[in-house]
Amino acid sequence: MRGREDANARVLGSQWGDEGKGKLVDILAREYDVVARCQGGANAGHTIYDDDGKKYALHLVPSGILNENATCVVGNGVVVHLPGMFDEIDALLKAGVDARGRMMVSDRAHLLFDLHKEIDGLREAELSGNKIGTTKRGIGPAYASKATRNGVRLGDIRDADKFANALRTLAADAAARFDGFEYDVEAEIVRYREIASRIEPFIADTVEYVNDAHRNGKKILVEGANATMLDLDFGTYPFVTSSNPAIGGVSNGLGLAPRKFETIIGVAKAYTTRVGAGPYPTELFGDVADKLRELGYEYGTTTGRPRRIGWLDMVALNYANQINGFTHLNITKLDVLSEMDELKIGVAYELPNGKTTTAFPADIATLENVKVVYETLPGWKTDIANVRSWDDMPENAKKYILRCEELSGVECRYIGVGPGRDAMVIKP
């Protein structure tokens, strides 16, 4: 199937991640010349399927890699664990997908080392009962190294002595900070000397590349990682990721001006999920949560952890739209709701002081104590996994989508009804 996009586009998560961004990017990628990642790292898990139904779980490689005509770009805003990236590249090659010559990584991108993963675990242990619930992929510590200006960039790997000294400094800083820190820095230096020659063909000035592509009329698709409600500035801080998955991270992470994008697609599940700790107003428990978790197979691509489950939260979705300015939405996993007798949408919050609001609070304590005001809609009790057109959609399923449009003020252009590439209804 093909999408309806004819302009440079950004695909962004509007909830807490795992919305299904990778599938839409995979579908749209066939219409684009460049598919780019702009932030995050291997904490992002994007699952896509080819036309034969073969499954690919990607973490660093952009989801557009299955489009043989697209160049995939890993931008400067991404933190890159090179061994993990090559594991993905090798797995793709074994499956018949060759990334060589079609993928480039920014020379400005910061490297994530195993020491960052070690620090991540030690930091979580320190927090004890106040754990963030990270993926322990080292993302936060890698961005911390970048922010404190002692990080190592991919381009540094070209100078063996400079690279080795920078890594030794990182290790010494970590050893001084954490009593239990154990890391063989010299072995890591040797390991990366071997990696250096292999990564060299992938290293590029991606800022120049994407801007040159734009000047030459090539279409660019940006694949966001994580999601707005995990954004370092706009998410449920401190229960957030360490980058900016919201709109600002695109320009910062690629070096491409905001005005060069016309389309901003927000991806949202027809219900919600969250992995890790943090406030989650519409969270469900008991039989309904268990049923949705099993029907939607809600287990993390990166961690395998069971995801928390909740009803669609329109307060959060409208907040994400306010920040990102979505031109349209992709509502995913609508098929998962097919067995439900009735559905609920959170439309407002009752605050602890008794007032009702449709604004998303910044204060975590407030968020943890709101009462959600729900609107109830009838279910459709019909399997929609094989529906491929809007006209064939059950009336109550249409009503659910149309109500989402009314409450958000944004067109729901793409409607996911299953995991496969073709399981997407494009609303006329």
From Swiss-Prot:
SMART domains for this protein: Adenylsucc_synt (SM00788)
Catalyzed reactions: IMP + L-aspartate + GTP = N(6)-(1,2-dicarboxyethyl)-AMP + GDP + phosphate + 2 H(+)
Record-annotated active site: D18 (proton acceptor), H46 (proton donor)
Gene Ontology CC: one annotated term: chloroplast
Residues the record lists as binding GTP: 17-23, 45-47, 307, 333-335, 416-418
Single biological process term from Gene Ontology: IMP metabolic process
Presence of keyword Iron-sulfur: no
Class in the EC hierarchy, top level: ligase
The keyword Plastid is assigned to this record: yes
Subunit description: Homodimer.
Miscellaneous section: This protein may be expected to contain an N-terminal transit peptide but none has been predicted.
Protein name, UniProt field: Adenylosuccinate synthetase, chloroplastic
Source organism per UniProt: Ostreococcus lucimarinus (strain CCE9901)
High-level lineage: Eukaryota, Viridiplantae, Chlorophyta, Mamiellophyceae, Mamiellales
Gene assigned in the entry: PURA
